[in-house]
Amino acid sequence: MGRGVRVLLLLSLLHCAGGSEGRKTWRRRGQQPPPPPRTEAAPAAGQPVESFPLDFTAVEGNMDSFMAQVKSLAQSLYPCSAQQLNEDLRLHLLLNTSVTCNDGSPAGYYLKESRGSRRWLLFLEGGWYCFNRENCDSRYDTMRRLMSSRDWPRTRTGTGILSSQPEENPYWWNANMVFIPYCSSDVWSGASSKSEKNEYAFMGALIIQEVVRELLGRGLSGAKVLLLAGSSAGGTGVLLNVDRVAEQLEKLGYPAIQVRGLADSGWFLDNKQYRHTDCVDTITCAPTEAIRRGIRYWNGVVPERCRRQFQEGEEWNCFFGYKVYPTLRCPVFVVQWLFDEAQLTVDNVHLTGQPVQEGLRLYIQNLGRELRHTLKDVPASFAPACLSHEIIIRSHWTDVQVKGTSLPRALHCWDRSLHDSHKASKTPLKGCPVHLVDSCPWPHCNPSCPTVRDQFTGQEMNVAQFLMHMGFDMQTVAQPQGLEPSELLGMLSNGS
């Protein structure tokens, strides 16, 4: 066992033993306790105690082995604190009841505090949007939980990056976790209240601001890092709000809190639909037209630096990741499936279980190529060539890899590269990649992709079965790889 791990083990055992009531004092009988150090005041009762920092400088040459030992150590020590730890996130409705969901009920958040940590993770839920009275009425009838807090449960269990289990969440399990339910239907951009004129309130941007304000009184004021994360509409919400959160904290007197973003499945393209349809509802409306209508209906706000890039009335451009990202000051890690199911849906691509015709197959392949191109200048990105949607709060989020690196590992590398800095490092850490974009050109060519099931039979399909189901000619696929079709099929069937 390396010196770094031995030291960590000793400190952790002392920390674990010292956290129990009736603490033992290890000194000879009659010996007086040593005086407290003069350089730092002891923390007041009830205040969080900072975790021991790790010095990685001595173990850079064998970081993977070191982190494997640390993870094993964390898992073995976890039970010593888990007995007193409630894993559930508890609901808190906002004290400022003027900041509401669509129907006027108070917005809120779920919180699980971790008193030994100065890292805070705020997660924005996703769930599409509505952009006029008719489809908002329909949404209220069918998806009321996404427009009202009246039936929210008192607690919820964190999964994926919100999990408090180190085996499911190896690097963030001990952070302060905040889940912010999506009840504004405005991609977290709205700033209009309910009134006689407006049947619904759209206050997504204001909800985030108010949650941050309340959390300052619950320990966020002592944070070192705030990671604003989100999936789908929540991922787009991260891009729209991360700089605003940093500016808010600075104005309130907390400039030292490092604000970062993690946008999952919210990096959409304003591309041409496969089949153009009239804009009658959320699903069939082209992305550009839906957002153009929505931003007016919601009184939506976008990042100021992005807004200045476009003429008045063209602010909708800032909802698209590749346009807003270059204007952001805060570092953002982008997670995006190259063949995102929500993107395909708004592009009117519907995979019905029938073999895909050549025109559609080429459209899907080109979509992956376009998305890959938009990520070429995003230094921190994870883009598997999979047909899926959302990942970071899925329990299987540790399974998917790009070029041999998992998403939690990539996020950890990114975290290290940003240590004590608000700017991305120019030189990536050796053996710790953060720009991970698949280069293979068809859906599910990455064998670690989530399982696909046949829509009619419900049976799982391996990669080879899925590609043939999609209508891919295996001869055409195998030839550029220098393989025979039978060899490629064998490799894909075995998960190679």
From Swiss-Prot:
Q: Which UniProt keywords apply?
A: Glycoprotein, Hydrolase, Phosphoprotein, Secreted, Serine esterase, Signal, Wnt signaling pathway
Task: Cite a single Pfam family from the UniProt record.
Answer: PAE
Q: What is this protein called?
A: Palmitoleoyl-protein carboxylesterase NOTUM
- EC number(s) on file: 3.1.1.98
Instruction: Output the superkingdom of the source species.
Output: Eukaryota
Family assignment? Belongs to the pectinacetylesterase family. Notum subfamily.
Chain positions covered by the region annotation Disordered: 21-46
Tissues with expression? Rarely expressed in adult normal tissues.
Q: What does this protein do?
A: Carboxylesterase that acts as a key negative regulator of the Wnt signaling pathway by specifically mediating depalmitoleoylation of WNT proteins. Serine palmitoleoylation of WNT proteins is required for efficient binding to frizzled receptors.
Record-annotated active site: S232, D340, H389
- Give the location in the cell: Secreted
